[in-house]
Amino acid sequence: MRYTVEYTSKALKSLKKLDKPVLLMIKSWIEKNLIGTTEPRRHGKGLTSNRSVQWMYRVGDYRIIADIEDEKLVILVVEVEHRSRVYK
């Protein structure tokens, strides 16, 4: 059973603001590691506190915050930001 990747409107808005090389790096990483995966938690780290149901993926100096919906086999990308701004 393979997972698909979907994006929230906030995540799409964040992606549009990125420089082209950074955008290509993040898209390439998502295609390589998340699209079609059977183990979406393998490359990420579970968050704690008020974001305990979300997962974080490191891509260079950027972070991808996602919800993993096992019953739908969907990885929902919630936020993409530079590491200095993502948790604020």
Segments from the language model and where they lie:
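Enriched for short, Lys/Arg-rich terminal
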Residues: 2-4, 9, 13, 17, ...
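Secondary-structure boundary motif
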Residues: 17-20, 36
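Intrinsic disorder/low-complexity segments in short proteins, especially the signal peptide
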Residues: 20-23, 52
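A short, surface-exposed loop/turn module that caps and links secondary-structure elements
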Residues: 31-56
